[in-house]
Every structure is written in C-alpha cells, then in structure tokens.
C-alpha cells in the first residue's frame, strides 16, 4: 500500500537532508525554490553574434564547439572571446594541439599574451588531461582547445603509419567530456573546442559534412557555431579581409538557428565598428542614404570603410551606438531572469 502524503513528504525531506549532508548543500533542490540564476556570459567581439546567441555572448561554465572550413575565422572568434574574458579580469588558457598559435596575431586581437596560459601537448590524452586539471583548479574563466582534429591518441602516435586505429579519438573525446562537463559548470569555466570539417563518403541525400572526434562533443556542447567565409572584402583591388557568416546550429540557453554576419579584417580580427554599422543601420540608429552613413545628423563617412574609420577614431560615438543597440535588444554582459519574467524555454536539439 502506498504511503500517505504526509509520510511521503517527510521521507523525502529526510532523504534530501541526508543527500545535503553527504554531498554538500544544494546537491538536490526544488527548481522553484530560488529565482533563476543569472546567465553570465563572455562577449564574442561581434555584437551581431552576441545578439544571435540570444544572451549577449558565450555562456560561462559550458562547452562550446566552433567548427567550419579552413581559414573561415574559427580561431579568430575564439581568440576574441579570450581577449574579452581577460579584459574583464579573467584568466585564460589555450591548448595549442595544432602547434599553430600566432602570438603576434593574438596580441593584435587584444589578447594579453604575457598572462595567457599556453600548452603544446604531444598527445590527445596529454592535452585533455592538462585541460581537465586547469579547469578543476577553479581559477580559469576560459579555455580553448585548438583543435579536436589535432588531438591524436597516444596509440596512433606510437604506432606505425599504416596502422588502423578505429574509434580511438571518439572514445578519448567521450571520456574527457564526461569528466570535464561537471567541473566546467562548478568552476564557471567556458571551454571552446575548435573543430574541423570532414566529408562522409557515399552520402546521397543531405549534407556530407561532419565534424571530427565522434558524436560526444555534439551532445555535450551547449552552443555549436558553424563559421563560414562568404566573400572577400576589398579596398580597391587589394583584399583586406573576409565577410563571415556564423550560424548558431545548437543553443541550449536560447532559441537556436539564428545567424550573424560580420567582417574579419586581416591582421585586426573581427571589426567591431563594422558590426556596429551593420546593426545600427538594421535597427534604425544609423541612416544610410546612398553610400553615406549618418548618425544623429552627423556624417560618419561615405562608404562603409570610411564610416568604420570614423568610429575607430571616435570611440565615444561607437560606444554610444553599441549601448543603444544593446538596450533595444536587451542584451549585455549578464542576463538576469526575474521571478516574474516569462522567458523562452531553451531548446536542445
């Protein structure tokens, strides 16, 4: 016979008290007991991408996957997040499994290379073990692993060139993510995994593209960003950068499938001013008449490049435009949810 309601409630309270005693206060709780915790974020460096993410940046304490073709801007997006985390007083680490990090380029993007923790591991196991130990220290704000494809299992490195090592990397990633996910959440560390694209052979319908490292990362990632270069930016006949499109293909903290476009300039990274012009025009703060851009009666310049240079030189105007865009769209450094707010439910695909 089932227990009476008061007895069941008392038994549940005793069980919860024992769980708190054994595993620490807050190990189990009723979801409605407290106001929903604020989602703390790290800005990406592009206001359009911050808007597409729905919360104003990359969520802290979560796994992020950034993937795309070669030279599409994956590492640039990750380094901008590192620079913004450091600018807020945070500590950042970069696991350079590809052995391709350019410190001079990172410095131009705003990364404090003197305080950046860098590791160039020999094997995939070593890379993920180092990452796990750094995360468990509780001192990190952001860690970047570049890239998943370069996390070569020890058995493959020590074996012969023609040996078959089916599924080794996938098992390695699955085990590492099982260990790291809880530690990331507890420490509030954002882990960015940069990934490469491969093509599945014999696919007749649908996209043949897939990412390396098995399926575990797709499941554990709270946000997945698909980065693509869509056109080359030119100043006259000289190529000066790329127009980049990022699609949020998975988002557990806000509705997914939104897109953002921004400029990545060679040697400079994401053009903050270019994003402000695009978003300003879209939301009516900047007026575009022919090739002229105007803000509150003041001419910014003829052509986007001149307007961008004006905002670069007049940071107060750029900051004012950014503030207005963020206020209109309701995004910022921290998104809080009041008890009475009705928020769209996060969608997990």
From Swiss-Prot:
Pfam families: RecA (PF00154), RecA_C (PF21096). It is found in: Cytoplasm. Disruption phenotype: Not essential in the absence of DNA damage, its deletion renders cells much more sensitive to DNA damaging agents such as UV light, ionizing radiation, alkylating agents and DNA gyrase inhibitors and desiccation-induced DSBs. 5-fold decrease in survival, loss of HR, no change in NHEJ (non-homologous end-joining) or single-strand annealing DSB repair. Phosphate binds at residues 71-75, 196. Its main location: cytoplasm. PROSITE patterns: RECA_1 (PS00321), RECA_2 (PS50162), RECA_3 (PS50163). GO terms for biological process: DNA recombination; DNA repair; SOS response. Keywords: ATP-binding, Cytoplasm, DNA damage, DNA recombination, DNA repair, DNA-binding, Nucleotide-binding, SOS response. CDD domains: RecA (cd00983). One of its GO terms (cellular component) is cytosol. It comes from the Bacteria. One of its GO terms (molecular function) is single-stranded DNA binding. The keyword 4Fe-4S does not apply. ATP binds at residues 71-76, 102-105. Required for homologous recombination (HR) and the bypass of mutagenic DNA lesions (double strand breaks, DSB) by the SOS response. Can catalyze the hydrolysis of ATP in the presence of single-stranded DNA, the ATP-dependent uptake of single-stranded DNA by duplex DNA, and the ATP-dependent hybridization of homologous single-stranded DNAs. Numerous X-ray crystals have been resolved under different conditions which indicate the flexibility of the protein, essential to its function. NCBIfam families: tigrfam_recA. Belongs to the RecA family. Polymerizes non-specifically on ssDNA to form filaments. Interacts with and activates LexA leading to autocatalytic cleavage of LexA, which derepresses the SOS regulon and activates DNA repair. This is Protein RecA. It comes from Mycolicibacterium smegmatis (strain ATCC 700084 / mc(2)155).
